[in-house]
Amino acid sequence: MSVNSNNSENLIDIFIDELWLEKGLSKNTLSAYRHDIHSFSLWYKGSSLLEVQRVDLLDYLSLRLKEGYSSRSTARSLSSLRAFYSHITVKYNLKENPTARVDSPKLGRSLPKTLSEEDVIKLINSPDVDDNIGLRDKAMLELIYACGLRVSELINLDILNLNLRQGVIRVIGKGEKERLVPMGEEALFWVQKYIEEGRPYLLKNDNKVSELFLSKRGKSMTRQTFWYRIKEYAIKSDINKDLSPHTLRHAFATHLINHGADLRTVQLLLGHSSLSTTQIYTEVARHRMKELHNEHHPRG
């Protein structure tokens, strides 16, 4: 079976389309698959991805690790390539799946990057709330930290999914799972202020965008835009850490546990399907306690 002379981009496009049709994966997940396979395709100089051998994959994975990519990132890349080659091995009747005898890199259990409560406050207070964009950013930072949202959940949050009277939001998480999360007084105040004073100026007259948070052009926000804004505010706040929107989700969970919240509650608020995923935040809390003990105890 041929596909336009086995053009690599066509192979990737067809795989992504069929993956969406068969499994109904989210846009972000499909984008991650495409990125991983496309990155390998750019590295591979053969005439077609159908000609890839096991040794090519081993060389590629080895190079990634040498260039400083983490074991976790490299394992994810291999996982995407496994799915791709499992699919096309059958579809194009390949003699062998080149990923079949390739082992994943061993993963150490790394602790999530988080922020102290003091740094979170500095970050959240850094936007200029007298400006419509700054007011939007203030509301976004307050909300993502107050509710422990994933960045995709934040930027896709529909204004109709807010219950301002009760102070809760309806979140559509991974696998279209829904959960209700309380906002807290500070986040509620700034979100309401943004809706009343900032959002009307960002929303264009002919625009019917239902997402809560809008770009300066009146369209839906992107993950990249919010990531960039966080980087700017980190610099402004003199926070010398590599921050991402997910850092505030980690901070939300860690700070809840530091203040005595039970794991089951944190699991429900985060939308984790497994309690074991949430348990890593107890390790973060213990690690931080050890750091403070070593730093401040006279015999630490």
Predicted regions and their residues:
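Conserved catalytic core of the tyrosine transesterase superfamily
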Residues: 1-300
